[in-house]
């Protein structure tokens, strides 16, 4: 179930910008579309983490996602909060959802969290 009002998810990211690793944060729908267009046109491998500020599992995996972004430098890492980007993320049914892109196309999707599981999937796509 989606929460209709954001609870300040971006405040955490803005105040801790140095803690984001190599993760691009999409603060709104327009920014997310720009990032997604860049991923598709550059054909660089990428992973998008769709989460929510009110999702406990999302909050648990986000620090690992940030840390892993430094370890997998060939991948572009993106975080999109489903409440901050409601139009472009309306197809997301579970949080967290991770989508993997290669050559501009979505090639894989992972639901749920687990640092080792995420690491293994990132390794597979890097």
UniProtKB/Swiss-Prot annotation:
Under Gene3D superfamilies, the record lists:
Glutaredoxin
Q: Which domain of life is it from?
A: Eukaryota
Segment Disordered: which positions?
Answer: 1-24
Q: Which PROSITE patterns match?
A: THIOREDOXIN_2
Disulphide-bridged cysteine pairs: 55-58
Q: Protein biosynthesis: is it a keyword of this entry?
A: no
- Iron-sulfur listed as a keyword: no
Pfam families found in the cross-reference section: Thioredoxin
Ranges for domain Thioredoxin: 5-126
Annotated active site: 55 (nucleophile), 58 (nucleophile)
InterPro entries annotated for this entry? Thioredoxin-like_sf, Thioredoxin_domain, TRL33
**Keywords from the named record:** Disulfide bond, Electron transport, Redox-active center, Transport
Q: Which PANTHER family match?
A: THIOREDOXIN-LIKE 3-3
The entry's function note states:
Probable thiol-disulfide oxidoreductase that may participate in various redox reactions.
Q: What protein family does this chain belong to? A: Belongs to the thioredoxin family.
- Name it: Thioredoxin-like 3-3
């Amino acid at each position: 179930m989606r929460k209709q009002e954001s609870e300040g998810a971006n405040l955490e990211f803005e105040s801790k910008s140095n803690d984001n690793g190599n993760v691009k944060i999409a603060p709104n729908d327009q920014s997310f579309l720009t990032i997604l267009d860049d991923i598709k046109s550059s054909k660089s491998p990428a992973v998008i983490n769709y989460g929510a500020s009110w999702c406990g599992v999302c909050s648990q995996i986000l620090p690992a996602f940030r840390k892993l972004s430094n370890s997998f430098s060939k991948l572009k890492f993106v975080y999109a909060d489903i409440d901050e980007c409601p139009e472009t993320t309306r197809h997301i049914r579970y949080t967290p959802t991770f989508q993997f892109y290669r050559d501009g196309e979505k090639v894989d999707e992972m639901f749920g969290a687990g640092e080792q599981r995420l690491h293994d999937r990132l390794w597979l796509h890097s």
